[in-house]
Amino acid sequence: MAPGPWPVSCLRGGPLGLTYLSLLLIPAAAGTYCECSLGLSREALIALLVVLAGISASCFCALVIVAIGVLRAKGETCPRQVDNRLVENFGVQEDLMDLHPVYVESQLMDADLEVSLVPPLEDQSLVAIPMEASSEEPPPPPPLPPE
């Protein structure tokens, strides 16, 4: 047995109500008389339906995109096959390689390495200008203006 018709108050806000309203507006779009008295003109109701249809379509597209993303994420639990040509041409893919850190320790010291690698400024014909030490204290900051 089919359920009875819904009360009119249930049809106002939901998608079924919007579908019902659009069915009422089909004769209005054809140029015939419309019995819907919502306080809006026929053109305003048609514009409202167009806007609501656009919003519904964009929400549906967003839902489809999210669903595809979730399905792809669930499908990538096993490692993928990687084309070796892509790895060679575009660099190393670290998530698929087993990298281990390498520590090198040496007890030998080279005499040349103990010398600083940066030459002194005097060798570059640059002169460092020393700051003059001033015994004067800086002047106090000006007082704040009254509020």
Swiss-Prot record:
Intracellular or extracellular location(s): Membrane; Cytoplasmic vesicle, Secretory vesicle, Acrosome
Bilayer topology term: Single-pass type I membrane protein
Keyword Cell cycle appears in the UniProt entry: no
Location of the region described as Disordered in the Swiss-Prot/TrEMBL record: 128-147
Coiled-coil intervals: none
Parts of the chain on the Extracellular side: 32-47
Stated name of the protein: Transmembrane protein 210
